[in-house]
Amino acid sequence: YGAGYELPAGMLASILGLEDEDRGLHVLRNILLAILGAFTVLFAGLIGRHLSNWRGAFFAALILFLSPRFLGHSFINPRDIPFAFGFLGSALFILLILKNFEKPRWRDIIGLTFCLGFALSVRSGGALMLYMFFLAFYAGLFFLQFVTKSPKLPKIGNVLKTLGIPVAGGFIFGVLLWPYALKDPINIVLESLAVFSEYPVSIRILFGGELLRSSDVPLTYLPTWISITVPLAFIAGLLLIVPYFKRIFANGPTYLIICLTVMFLAPFGYVLLSDPGLYDGWRHFTFFYVTGVPLAALGWEAFSQWVEDKNWKPWIGPVVLGLLMVEPAVHIARNYQYPYVYFNPLVGGVSGAFGNYELDYWGISTRQAVEELERQGVLHADMEPIVLVTNFRYGVQNWLAPEYRDKVEVEYARYRERYELEWDYAIWISRFMDGTHMKAVDWPSSTRTMHPITVNSTPISAIYKKGEPHVFEGKKALDEGRIEEAIEHLNNEIEYNPKNYLAHRFLGMSVARTGDWETALSHFETSLKYAPEDQAAVINYAIAKINLGDYSDAKLALHEMLETFSNSHGGWYYLALANFREGELSLAAQYIQRTVQVRQDFRPGWQLGIQIFEQMGDEQRADLFRNRLEQL
């Protein structure tokens, strides 16, 4: 990443005397991003004007402005919105250069230079634009030459000269705003593109109701996310191009339309070829969406012209478009704090996406949660010190007011590990939660729920209060080996909060310490009822089944878990143990080797391996495991 946006934003904040802990800093950044978003809407409208007419320009601007995902990100996203601004601005100016290719205007060349450089300074994908724009330009030029057969058209060499200035200038400008790239501009830009193609971070994401790794998403990930989160008017506009294809391309300017179409489709081709890691829906491809909006507007303009040709009322086309835009507009008005949490009617709105797709993946609702704690008198200048735990620490920490910030100890914890530490209040964002758990308990159904943050009545985050301390005391007693106390506390917790799957798991673990595996199993089954994909619950369920001699059920549960969590050393270990107990030594050997590959310092894995290979009569591999164990 470069500093195309961060540098001017930081300089302006410094001039205004804003520090990192000031709320005003975040307001300033929101305003600057909104300005870039407004210019992006303007660019979309201008492209629509050059592809059709002023009505087409209005259609494009309307669709983009009332796109909840785009509008929401235009206030919060310091990477994808600046990049979309640079990308669409570059598309506009390259279309203008192509339109006036015989004598390009200097203002268009300068505009392309600035937008290309700005996009490159924000994200290395700007370098990809250099190649893509050449491809798009040649596509438009080739079509123009083919259709007109005009000897007046410039040769490819002249085109290279025309584009050489903005391309070279844009590259230099972009690198100047990217301090890291100044060391070795060419190689570092290429390196960053390679990193994007094979993104090294793999996080858990919710897609189609299943937890996946961002590095292993299917090819349907991007088209699915786009189709269920854009306004229906956008989809309809693209579909309208099909029946009115001849009208659109006959009316022209055909070469400009082809050029923009290449810019629109090329990113999809890149994703299919490079297969990069994807997460957070399509926010990384906001530039792709904004490029497609003028094309969708072309479809609506062609439909409106067809209506007029039929001598029907000329307002029918705009009214139909307007009616389709009512639904996203109402969503924006109702949820102006976080309009980007939007799903269209194809998936049943936000309620249909609940537990199936990530909702507030940016964690914006932490602001509303902090402000709710202020309204309820929890956070104020004269408050007593508290511990506030959250799974989105940055958003919470940076919205605490200065007058009480030093009295709030903000701690990070995963939602599934929320009882590993003591806390007074908690703010939980639904991101990274198991969708099956959210739907099973109708999250947040906890007795500790103090206030849910909702979008169209669907919760996206929740404030918890500590409430009764049963589960905290029970977990502490379990960890310290005070089993009878743990059982008492956890039984009280389940009476207080029946759907607390962690309490059921802890109680099962406590009862298992007494040797009552039947009762322990019942608690693990209840835990899985409320959290079917909880790894620890699955493993404890399998342990209980193994101890009861039901190896087939244990293996089935572990195999299903390992399909999603293939790096679970515990899963592989108990799968090996189940097969070992059942006498399936070959499979046990295979799984125990996988165990120590996943976690090489796991002593029980090496110990079980010794037993397996000794029973197989394979003393050589038993000695290898024995030697490795001695080195730990």
Which role fits each region the language model picked out?
Residues 83-100, 111-115, 264, 291-298:
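Specific aromatic-rich, kink-prone transmembrane helix
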Residues 31-51, 89-93:
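Transmembrane-helix motifs of polytopic, lipid-linked glycan transferases
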